[in-house]
Each structure stands twice: as structure tokens, then as C-alpha cells.
């Protein structure tokens, strides 16, 4: 049988990915609180973004279901927000967000990907220069690519290079937009947002876009993220975050000026041309966010746990740039990283390998993603497993 010529490219790509140890498949697993069941094994889930442990908190969910009003018990908005999908609970959540962050307005979206892929094309035209950290998330990269702006990627966390680029280019463009994450999703390090805000304020045509996806809920006295922690909530033009991680829900948000809110409603394609979030999910997000400042004990516990695990990774001899609850164990080669992940799973820890193109070549890693719900005894066992000599052959890791 002659192979269809039209499929050869895809087949060759998959074979190449398999040879390089980078072929992905969708994992099948059963969830039970902080535990994962897979292939007959019960493993501690150290790969989840449920940073505060709210997604596995059945008591909290039952409290919500008892209290949610009938008007919000809708499983679909059935329309774009600009048609018939703009429910009262959407507006209430946005008012709550704006009030907590001390900003004029907030706007919510169906996902963090929609958020990052939509704002930059809406606000960055051909007279705009975007200065983006080298390691920003794929959704931000795609948003930059869809925009008409010119883009320069500055070296990761290199403030001096960024400062030099702003000084060099600010007069040549109508607008410069600095784009960064606050807690970086793969290294777990933290951006100097206060310094970036001061740099922005020195130039009237410079704006600051910050993605707090991995920080909101977890960092800051009230759980409002690194911007709260560093005292610059009011200085960030586009302060973005997600509901799908620490807040245990779905969707995303930006807090901004009223002018920018109204502009995005009129020009942001990923808001205009998509179905709004279901009212029931929005009601859950509102329920969770309204209680966020009361979970400081969970944030403290998570920070303490992360410090222990970071110490274990460093004592085991692995590079670890983390300053947060995201703790990378950088192995290097993809095949060795897959083997290391298998070893950790054999020891009872559900940890997955992260490989190119998610991370640069030669930096494949295990990404330990910690949550406040992990039992103390299991965290101690995780520390011991990280520090223990490998049970694989010398050539395996």
C-alpha cells in the first residue's frame, strides 16, 4: 500500500520526536485528592498547579454548592459577552477583582491563553516595540507574534539589558511595552517587578505587562501576587492572572484602567469572538477569590515546604534557580530526564518530565509543583527521594 504523500511530514516529525526523547502522549490517571493512580500505582501528585490545595478541598466545594444562588446555576453562557453571555455574576466578579487590587477596572477571559494571546495584538500596533523576557510563556509569545509590533527578547531577568534597550529605543516608537511573568513557570524564579515599574515610570510612553499566573493566590499578604509583595500593584498597566491554578477554577483576568478596559472590549478578538465563561464557574471563582485573604496559613505552609524541597534539590547537586513553589530539577538531556521521572514515579511520586520546546535544549527537567495540601510526612519522603542516590544505571541518568 502506497503511503499518502500528504501525511509523510507528520509521520517524520513524530519519528524524530521519538528518537530525541521528546514525543508526547496524553497521560491517563485517576485523581484522589493529592494522589494520582496510574498503571496500578498510587503516587503523590507533585505535578499539579493546585497550589493552595483548593481543588481537592471537598468541604469548600460543598459549602459553595450549598450557597450558590439559583440564577448562577448555569453550565454555559451560550454566547459571547457582547451578545447574550454577559451575566450579572461576570460583572460582580470583575468588580470584586478591581476592588481587591485597588484598580479602576477588571476584565475576565475564558483562559489564560485567550488573555495573553488577545491583549497584545489589540494594543500593540506597528508603532509599538515589545520588550519581552526571553522565558515568557508560549501564550505571550503567540500574542506577540499576532501583533503588528516589533519585538526584542531580552536575556532572562537581565535588568541592565532591558534598561539599555528602553533607553535606546523609547524615542523611536510611540509605545514600548515591557512583558514579563512574575513567577516564571519553568525556573520558578521571581521578577523584580518594583524595579521594572520604576523603569517604566521614567518614560511616558512605556507600559508594563505582567503575568501573575503562578503567583496570584500564593504570594503577597492577601494572596494578590508578587506585585502586592513588592508594593507595585498600582504601577502595572496590565496586571494579569489566571483562575485555573491556585484559585482552583477556570479562566483568567486583567486589572487595568477603565480606558483600557473599554478599549479591549471593542478591540480584543479573543474576548469578542468566544463564548463567555459559564456562570457556575464564575460564581465559584467569585466565592474562592472573596476568601483569598483568609488563607495566609496555606501560603505560609507552601512557602516552608518549597524551601525544604529547594534545599534537597541543591544538596543533590542539581541546578535550582527557584525562589518559589515551582522547583525545577534540571537533568539536561531529554532521555535522561524521562528516566529520572520514571524513577521518581517508581518511588511513589507523580512527577513529569519537561522537555523542548517547552524548555531550551539541554535543560530538560523534572518540574516539582508543590501544593499546600501535601502531607508533611510525604514531603519529608520526597526530600529523601530527591537526595537519595539514583537506582538507575550510571548511563541512565
Question: Which residues does each predicted region cover?
Answer:
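Active-site PLP attachment segment
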Residues: 222, 228-263
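Active-site phosphate-binding strand-loop segment of PLP-dependent enzymes
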Residues: 50, 152, 156-210
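Conserved N-terminal alpha-helix of the aminotransferase class I/II PLP-enzyme fold
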Residues: 62-112
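Conserved PLP-binding catalytic core of the aspartate aminotransferase-like
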Residues: 300-307, 314-348, 363, 370-372
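Structural motif of enzymes handling amino- and sulfur-group chemistry
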Residues: 276-295, 301, 305, 314
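N-terminal "arm"/small-domain region of PLP-dependent enzymes with the aminotransferase-like
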Residues: 9-75, 206
Amino acid at each position: 500500500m502506497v503511503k499518502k504523500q500528504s501525511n509523510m511530514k507528520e509521520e517524520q516529525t513524530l519519528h524524530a520526536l521519538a528518537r530525541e526523547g521528546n514525543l508526547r502522549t496524553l497521560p491517563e490517571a485517576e485523581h484522589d485528592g493529592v494522589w494520582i493512580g496510574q498503571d496500578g500505582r498510587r503516587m503523590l501528585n507533585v505535578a499539579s498547579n493546585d497550589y493552595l490545595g483548593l481543588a481537592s478541598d471537598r468541604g469548600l466545594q460543598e459549602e459553595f454548592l450549598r450557597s450558590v444562588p439559583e440564577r448562577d446555576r448555569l453550565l454555559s453562557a451560550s454566547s459571547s459577552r457582547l451578545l447574550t453571555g454577559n451575566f450579572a455574576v461576570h460583572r460582580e466578579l470583575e468588580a470584586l477583582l478591581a476592588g481587591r487590587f485597588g484598580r479602576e477596572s477588571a476584565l475576565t477571559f475564558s483562559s489564560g491563553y485567550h488573555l495573553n494571546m488577545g491583549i497584545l495584538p489589540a494594543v500593540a500596533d506597528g508603532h509599538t516595540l515589545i520588550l519581552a523576557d526571553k522565558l515568557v510563556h508560549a501564550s505571550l509569545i503567540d500574542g506577540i507574534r499576532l501583533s503588528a509590533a516589533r519585538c526584542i527578547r531580552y536575556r532572562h531577568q537581565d535588568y541592565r539589558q532591558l534598561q539599555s534597550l528602553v533607553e535606546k529605543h523609547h524615542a523611536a516608537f510611540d509605545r514600548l511595552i515591557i512583558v514579563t511573568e512574575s513567577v516564571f513557570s519553568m525556573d520558578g524564579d521571581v521578577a523584580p517587578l518594583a524595579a521594572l515599574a520604576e523603569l517604566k515610570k521614567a518614560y511616558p510612553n512605556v507600559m508594563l505587562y505582567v503575568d501573575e499566573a503562578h503567583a496570584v493566590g500564593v504570594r503577597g499578604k492577601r494572596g494578590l501576587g508578587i506585585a502586592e509583595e513588592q508594593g507595585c500593584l498600582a504601577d502595572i498597566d496590565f496586571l494579569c492572572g489566571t483562575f485555573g491554578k491556585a484559585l482552583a477554577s477556570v479562566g483568567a483576568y486583567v486589572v487595568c484602567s477603565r480606558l483600557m478596559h473599554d478599549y479591549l472590549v471593542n478591540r480584543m478578538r479573543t474576548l469578542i469572538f468566544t463564548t463567555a465563561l459559564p456562570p457556575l464557574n464564575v460564581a465559584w471563582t467569585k466565592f474562592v477569590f472573596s476568601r483569598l485573604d483568609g488563607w495566609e496559613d496555606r501560603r505560609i505552609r507552601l512557602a516552608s515546604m518549597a524551601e525544604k524541597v529547594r534545599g534537597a534539590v541543591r544538596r543533590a547537586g542539581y541546578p535550582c534557580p527557584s525562589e518559589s513553589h515551582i522547583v525545577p530539577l534540571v537533568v539536561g538531556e531529554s532521555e535522561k530526564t524521562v528516566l529520572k521521572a520514571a524513577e521518581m514515579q517508581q518511588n511513589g511520586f507523580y512527577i513529569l518530565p519537561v522537555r523542548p520546546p517547552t524548555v531550551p535544549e539541554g535543560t530538560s527537567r523534572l518540574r516539582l509543583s508543590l501544593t499546600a495540601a501535601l502531607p508533611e510526612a510525604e514531603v519529608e519522603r520526597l526530600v529523601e527521594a530527591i537526595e537519595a542516590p539514583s537506582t538507575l544505571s550510571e548511563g541512565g541518568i
